[in-house]
Amino acid sequence: MLAEQKLAELISDALEGLAQDIAVEAHASIGGLYDGDEVAAIRERTIHYLGGLAESLRQNDPDIFLAPVEQGVRGRLANGFTALSILSYADTAEAALLRLAANASGDPYERNRYIMSIRAMIGRSRSLITNTSKQWLAEQKTEAEQKAEGKQPTA
């Protein structure tokens, strides 16, 4: 029970840290650039991505987070986060991760393996989402600049 409580704290702290990091990143990169509809669309893509993670966890497959990142996974990555979207996911993720750890509770080596999988998932998610967000935002800015140049009258 004490080990599960410690694991719950680890997961909760990691998810809260991830939520804070991504909320700061989203406000810095998205704030002021997009209107409410565009931010809502980004939030929907975020929920879709997190739903995919939750489904993988429900299938008791933590190794998916240790595998090389495939193009299909990148295609589902959200272009930004809001604190609300990830915090609404945290309860589902925490419950699923605790079930994974409970499955390995008989073997300390396996429990540690699951904890490392969780850490890898959170670290990889933070890195991929941040990098993908920055790349996507740069592409959007370039497209907007090109459209603006195309609309300007030529002298």
List PLM regions with ranges.
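N-terminal low-complexity or simple alpha-helical regulatory segments
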Residues: 1-84
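Long, amphipathic alpha-helical coupling/dimerization segments that relay conformational signals between
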Residues: 3, 65-155
